């Protein structure tokens, strides 16, 4: 009986230590992300299969103004634009001449942008964070089969230098950021989108 009590005590101590560590790691990531009010960077994206085969490469520009505003512009190999004003998100494809409108809160659910663009306390509560070496590994506490996990890395200036999205089935999207000094404020309307004439509109709000 005494041995059983000892084993249970060890297990409980281990569990509580893990829970405290996860809470501390979550707070540390939150503080790191809260240090910046904006991001202005070039990005490169590489998508790979679960087996490691490269499926896609792209490059572009990323601008984030916390909370909730961002502009994601793919320049190569095919132009695409995603813009959020904090309420609405526009996804525009010049190639097919179509723009899709979404509620921001729905659109970024389950993506790194929910944390990058300024998550609130209730949104942070949905995620478990574990720091492993220089990486912050983020997983949804609910743990459904559709859930993605994220990895964040920071440079010596405490800027986000890389984030990774790992799909439930193992597909991996890796984004590397090269930060640029913002020499002047973004022009008014930078985080708005004016729909071009003749473009097909898919409003899903």
Swiss-Prot record:
One matching Pfam family: LolA
Q: Where in the cell is it found?
A: Periplasm
Q: Where is the signal peptide?
A: 1-22
Give a yes or no for keyword Ribonucleoprotein in this entry.
no
Q: Which GO terms describe its biological process?
A: lipoprotein localization to outer membrane; lipoprotein transport
One GO term describing the cellular component: outer membrane-bounded periplasmic space
- Job of this protein: Participates in the translocation of lipoproteins from the inner membrane to the outer membrane. Only forms a complex with a lipoprotein if the residue after the N-terminal Cys is not an aspartate (The Asp acts as a targeting signal to indicate that the lipoprotein should stay in the inner membrane).
HAMAP family on file: LolA (MF_00240)
Q: What is this protein called?
A: Outer-membrane lipoprotein carrier protein
Could you tell me which species this protein originates from? Psychromonas ingrahamii (strain DSM 17664 / CCUG 51855 / 37)
Q: Which gene encodes it?
A: lolA
């Amino acid at each position: 009986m005494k041995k059983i009590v000892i084993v249970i005590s060890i297990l409980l101590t281990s569990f509580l230590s893990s829970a405290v560590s996860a809470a501390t790691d979550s707070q540390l990531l939150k503080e790191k992300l809260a240090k910046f009010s904006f991001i202005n960077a070039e990005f490169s994206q590489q998508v790979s299969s679960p087996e490691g085969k490269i499926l896609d490469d792209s490059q572009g520009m990323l601008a984030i103004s916390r909370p909730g505003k961002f502009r994601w512009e793919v320049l190569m190999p095919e132009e695409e634009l995603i813009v959020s004003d904090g309420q609405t998100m526009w996804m525009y494809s010049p190639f097919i001449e179509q723009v899709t409108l979404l509620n921001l809160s729905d659109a970024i659910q389950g993506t790194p942008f929910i944390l990058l663009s300024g998550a609130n306390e209730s949104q942070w509560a949905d995620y478990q964070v574990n720091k492993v070496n220089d990486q912050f590994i983020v997983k949804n506490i609910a743990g459904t089969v559709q859930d993605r996990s994220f990895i964040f890395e920071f440079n010596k200036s405490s800027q986000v230098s890389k984030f990774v999205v790992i799909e439930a089935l193992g597909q991996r999207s890796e984004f590397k950021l090269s930060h640029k000094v913002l020499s002047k404020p973004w022009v008014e309307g930078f985080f708005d989108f004016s729909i071009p004439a003749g473009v097909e509109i898919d409003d899903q709000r």
